[in-house]
Amino acid sequence: MEEEKILESDLRHISFVMPKYTPIEKIGEGSFSVVYKALDAESGRYVALKAITRTSSPARVLDEMMFLKTLGGRKNCMGLLGCFRNEDQVVAVFPYFEPIDFREFISNANLADIKRYLHNLLIAIEHVHSNGIMHRDLKPGNFLYNKESGRGMLIDFGLAQYEEYSEGQHAEGGAKPAGPLLFFNSVVSKTKPPGYYERDGRPPMKAPRAGTRGFRAPEVLFRCQRQTGAIDMWSVGVIFLTILTTQYPFFYSSDDIDSIVEIATIFGHAEMRKAAKFYGRVWRSNIDSIPEERIPFETIVESLNPWAEVGSDGYDLLYRMLDLCSSSRITASDALSHPFFDDLKTHENCA
């Protein structure tokens, strides 16, 4: 079969693990790795083989293995069964976890399903953050969820980092330049028609830019050097909004410029000015699609998914996750204690 020929060609570079593991099919592929479902010849169980690309930084690979050793196998974080190396090729072995397709999940998830999904994800994030680590690439593809069992697994710690700043520093806001810096599209063009935006000609601030477009927090887009686990909670909020609206992806931006504009079309100029000031930036724009005041999440959800079951507690949690200012954004620990999950916890206690 053609599929087998392609599979054999793909697997030549990891043939050194094939005496022990028999690859069955490719189940995932990213910028830095390819993942295969395989059979463990010794145990007879399925496993996932993650073949890390040769172009990956050795330090990055080592860091990922370190984070997996620290976090894996507990609190909904994927465990590491083993790791093999042959010259510059690394293959990590994980338990195989059968997830539901995210698009299928959001197409028919009820409120109880949504609560279980988010609760599982938050348990993993709280575990990560309690160890002083930021995941930095939260998105549906990195959280495997099995609807039948009601269990989820956080995967891919390739971009994870330890937090470098204390809570006190974090609360002060973002990077503090000597003078106000206009961010990307915030320069108002005097020679172009309304709605036009252009780049600030000055050199951009250098700061960590991990994550996937559409899930990056405002402080990442504003190029702030002080970043904490709050960036993960923004990503959880985007996932929550995506589920409620059934729009995946919710943000379609192709780059950071478009990303901040998309956020601004929801939050409005007034909120963007406050956030920019918090991060030591200046926000100005004459783009017609950006309102002065924010559009309520209730309006967005009801217009895109009139049948959505959310409730006041659900919206409150959504607002606290998608808070433009990182210091007041809800933490994973506090989110787990939010009233939105009260009936879920009561049900679990009675089970």
Swiss-Prot record:
Q: Where along the chain is ATP bound?
A: 27-35, 50
Catalytic activity entry: L-seryl-[protein] + ATP = O-phospho-L-seryl-[protein] + ADP + H(+); L-threonyl-[protein] + ATP = O-phospho-L-threonyl-[protein] + ADP + H(+)
One BP annotation, GO: regulation of cell cycle
Domain Protein kinase: start-end pairs: 21-341
**Family annotation (InterPro entries):** CK2_alpha, Kinase-like_dom_sf, Prot_kinase_dom, Protein_kinase_ATP_BS, Ser/Thr_kinase_AS
What residues sit in the active site? 137
The enzyme's E.C. designation: 2.7.11.1
Q: Does the keyword Mitochondrion apply?
A: no
Q: One of this protein's Pfam families, by short name?
A: Pkinase
Q: Which GO terms describe its molecular function?
A: ATP binding; metal ion binding; protein serine kinase activity; protein serine/threonine kinase activity
Gene Ontology terms: cellular component: cytosol; nucleus; protein kinase CK2 complex
Q: What SMART domains has UniProt attached to this entry?
A: S_TKc
Arranged from A to Z, the UniProt key words for this protein are: ATP-binding, Cell cycle, Cell division, Kinase, Magnesium, Meiosis, Metal-binding, Mitosis, Nucleotide-binding, Serine/threonine-protein kinase, Transferase
Report the cofactors. Mg(2+)
- PANTHER family, alphabetized: CASEIN KINASE II SUBUNIT ALPHA (PTHR24054:SF0)
Quote the function comment for this protein: Serine/threonine-protein kinase. Needed for the initiation of DNA synthesis during mitosis as well as for synaptonemal complex formation and commitment to recombination during meiosis.
Q: What family classification does the UniProt entry report for this protein?
A: Belongs to the protein kinase superfamily. Ser/Thr protein kinase family. CDC7 subfamily.
Q: What is this protein called?
A: Probable cell division control protein 7 homolog 2
